Amino acid sequence: MESSNCKVITPLLSQRHRRMVTKDGHSTLQTDGAPRGLVYLRDAWGTLIDMRWRWVMLVFSASFVLHWLVFAVLWYVLAEMNGDLELDHDAPPENHTICVKYITSFTAAFSFSLETQLTIGYGTMFPSGDCPSAIALLAIQMLLGLMLEAFITGAFVAKIARPKNRAFSIRFTDLAVVAHRDGKPNLIFQVANIRHSPLTSVRVSAVLYQERENGQLHQTSVDFHLDGISSEECPFFIFPLTYYHSITPSSPLVTLLQHENPPHFELVVFLSAMQEGTGEICQRRTSYLPSEIMLHHCFASLLTRGSKGEYKVKMENFDKTVPELPTPLVSKSPHRTDLDIRINGQSIDNFQISETGLTE
C-alpha cells in the first residue's frame, strides 16, 4: 500500500533531446546516398505493405485506371486495324466481321475496357465470336485483371491483419524510475496491454546507445527481469507488467545514473509477444533519455480491489510516480512479522503474522 506521506505527481517532460527511436517506436535514422528506387522495386510487396494508407489507396486507384487505359488503347488499335472505326455498325458490309460492336472512338474503347474488367455485363458493345483477335485480347485482359485484383486484395488483407496493428495496444510508461527493491537500486519501467485479449510468450530486451568521442555509436545490451520469473519470457500478459534492471557494479548504467545530470544516452526497449488468436509475433518499442529517468522515485500502485474482490487496473496511475522515501524504522514484536502481498511488483495488501494468527 502507498505511504501516506508520499505525494503522487505526474512529471512533465520539459527538455527534448535528439533521439534515435521515438516514444512510439519509430526510427528517426536517415540514410543518405543509398540507392532507393531499385531496392523498393525489387521488394514491391513489402514496399506496398509499409506504405501509408493514403498512398496505398492512390496506388490501388492508379493501378486499375492504368489497366483500363492500356487495354482501351489495345481495343482501339484492334478496331483501327480491323477497319471498324469508319464503318456503320448497324449496316456493316457483308464480307466484313466487326471485332467489337460499336467501338467507333477511344471513349467507346475505354468504356468497353471498363465493362470487361468489372464484368458488369455488355450492353450494345460486345465482342464477336468470329473475331479471334478480340477473343484473345479479351482473355488476356481478364487474366491480367484477375491477377491485379488478387494482388491488391491480398495487400489490403495483409496490411489490415499485420501484427504491427496489435502492437499499438501495448503501452510503455513515459518515464522510467530508479528505486530501491530489496535494498538494491533498480531501473524500473512498466508496460500495459490495453486490450482484453491476452498476449503470450512476452520477451523484453533493451539496448543502451552511447555516442563515443570518436563519433561512433556504441551499443550495450541491458538485461531486464520480471519479478521472480526465472525464464526469459512471461507466459501470460493481461495486466500491467513491471520490469527491473538491477544496477550492480557490472551494470552498464551504474556510471550513468550516479549523479543527477548524467551524460546523454538512449535506452531503447523492445517487447515481443505472440498473439493468442493468430500465433503471430508483434513487437513494440520505446526509448528513454536521461531526462526521462526519475531518480529516487517509484511508480504509483495500479492494482486495486473491486467491491466483489476482483482486481482492477487504475490506468490513470500508469504514468504517475511517487517520491521514494526512506523506510522508517519501526520496532516490531519478536513474534510478529509484516507480510506485503505483491502481484507483479504492485502492492495489494499488508498482513501481519503473529502467534495468534493473521491480522490485516
Swiss-Prot record:
Activity regulation note: Inhibited by Ba(2+) and Cs(+), although sensitivity to those inhibitors is much lower than in other Kir channels.
Intramembrane annotation ranges? 106-122
Q: Does the keyword Phosphoprotein apply?
A: yes
Q: How is it modified after translation?
A: Phosphorylation at Ser-201 by PKC strongly inhibits ionic currents, while phosphorylation at Ser-287 by PKA increases them.
Record carries keyword Transcription regulation: no
* Molecular function per GO: inward rectifier potassium channel activity
Q: How does it sit in the membrane?
A: Multi-pass membrane protein
Positions of the record's site feature: Role in the control of polyamine-mediated channel gating and in the blocking by intracellular magnesium = 149
Provide the membrane-side ranges marked Extracellular in the record. 78-105, 123-131
Q: Which reaction does it catalyse?
A: K(+)(in) = K(+)(out)
Positions of post-translational Phosphoserine modification = 201, 287
Ranges spanned by the short sequence motif Selectivity filter, renumbered to the chain = 119-124
What residues form the membrane-spanning segments? 51-77, 132-157
The segments annotated as topological domain Cytoplasmic are 1-50, 158-360
Record's keyword terms, sorted: Cell membrane, Ion channel, Ion transport, Membrane, Phosphoprotein, Potassium, Potassium transport, Transmembrane, Transmembrane helix, Transport, Voltage-gated channel
A cellular-component GO term for this protein: monoatomic ion channel complex
List the disulfide bonds in this chain. none
Q: Which InterPro entries match?
A: Ig_E-set, IRK_C, K_chnl_inward-rec_Kir, K_chnl_inward-rec_Kir_cyto, KCNJ13, Kir_TM
Q: Which GO terms describe its biological process?
A: potassium ion import across plasma membrane; regulation of monoatomic ion transmembrane transport
Can you say where in the cell this protein is located? Membrane; Cell membrane
- Give the family this protein belongs to, as stated in its UniProt record: Belongs to the inward rectifier-type potassium channel (TC 1.A.2.1) family. KCNJ13 subfamily.
Please give the subunit comment from the record.
Homotetramer.
In UniProt terms, what function does this protein have? Inward rectifier potassium channels are characterized by a greater tendency to allow potassium to flow into the cell rather than out of it. Their voltage dependence is regulated by the concentration of extracellular potassium; as external potassium is raised, the voltage range of the channel opening shifts to more positive voltages. The inward rectification is mainly due to the blockage of outward current by internal magnesium.
Quote the protein name from its UniProt record. Answer: Inward rectifier potassium channel 13
Q: Which gene encodes it?
A: KCNJ13
